[in-house]
């Protein structure tokens, strides 16, 4: 299974600092983190590309809250979507990671283009 689940999925709550979100991104190695609420519902996403833009704008990683710099219109998919369809979404949107949710918008996993490549699915 190419979908990362459980502790392998980078996720933080909206009230953490950018610094804490970066630790989560680094620890999980996906180049992004999901932002979730207390019920694990997806609120947004923050990527390494966003980090470059945020730092370029002069943000302080110790005081900036992730809620102030996250993207709320992130692309998601469902666990029953075929890998080929997930790859189409990634390529069409020029993104490298895709959050996976259930029908209620709860985070259940993440897909990464490099994982799909490693599994020979592209």
Description of each model-found segment:
Residues 30-33, 43-44:
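Conserved active-site beta-strand-loop modules that form the wall/rim of enzyme catalytic pockets
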Residues 50-64, 116-122:
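A short, polar/charged loop-to-alpha-helix boundary motif
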Residues 1-9, 63-74:
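Bateman (tandem CBS) regulatory domains
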Residues 9, 42-43, 101, 107-108:
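Short hydrophobic beta-strand segments in globular cytosolic domains
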Residues 53, 60-72, 79-83:
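Short alpha-helical segments enriched in small residues
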Residues 12-29, 36, 55, 76-95, ...:
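The conserved cystathionine-beta-synthase
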Residues 44-49, 96, 108-116:
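Short hydrophobic beta-strand motif reused across regulatory alpha/beta modules
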């Amino acid at each position: 299974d190419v979908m990362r689940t459980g502790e392998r999925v980078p996720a933080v709550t909206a009230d953490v600092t950018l610094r804490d979100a970066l630790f989560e991104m680094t620890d999980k190695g996906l180049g992004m983190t999901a932002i979730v609420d207390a019920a694990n519902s997806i609120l947004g996403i923050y990527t390494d590309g966003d980090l470059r833009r945020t730092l370029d704008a002069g943000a302080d990683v110790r005081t900036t809250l992730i809620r102030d710099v996250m993207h709320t219109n992130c692309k998601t998919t469902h666990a029953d979507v075929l890998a080929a369809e997930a790859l189409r979404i990634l390529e069409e949107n020029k993104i490298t990671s895709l959050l996976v949710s259930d029908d209620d918008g709860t985070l259940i996993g993440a897909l990464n283009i490099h994982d799909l490549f490693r599994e020979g699915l592209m």
